[in-house]
Amino acid sequence: MKFDSISSAIKEIKKGGMVIVLDNEDRENEGDLVMASDAVSSANINFMAKEGRGLICISVSKPRAKKLDLEPMEQRNTSLHETAFTVSVDAVKGTTTGISASDRCKTIKTIVSDRTKPSDLARPGHIFPIVGRNGGVLRRAGHTEASMDLAQLAGFSRSGVICEIIGDDGEMLRGPDLMKFAKKHNLKIISIEDLIRFRRKKESIVQKLEEIKLPTKFGDFDLHMYDDISVSYTHLTLPTTPY
């Protein structure tokens, strides 16, 4: 399959548009509609529901989930790819049944608003938050993390709206059928693999956290701490002085 460039997808997201993101063949091997939560409209939600036909979800960071008391849907996550669903929600104000395109758009806007309190969300509801990993696709090569990375790269807050793409036969669209869908709706299509390469090329993966003095019986040393955002641990180094 021939994919569009990550740069072109970021430009589309920045304009408030939608793109298709494909994960690896050895994973779910599915394409999802993805856009920035900050830019979502009722028309976007209607398109996802009508043309995408999958579950409409919103990716959120761990701090956002904690602030809004978005508890895990299941404490013991045994799903195949450990997708971190929280309990589903609806916005308390400005919605009716919660399922309409306008209601779901309102709920998404409520989730990403800095003014929102836990009490502003009813549980359960019709929007499904998913908590993304710190480090994005460098830590987990999933659609959740890809949507967060793309939104951030486009200058929005770190949250995306995602929806799987299902065909007329009720099965996931893949391969040539997914490309036809992208062409029909004039959508960019990218791979998570390319997004990983893009981030590794453009960003500093290892970041210095702190430098402290470490006194020992052999003398004082400088202990340097580094965070590798692609893994879940910290590196420690003890630089030596050249002879």
Give each language-model segment a name.
Residues 1-236:
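Catalytic domains of riboflavin
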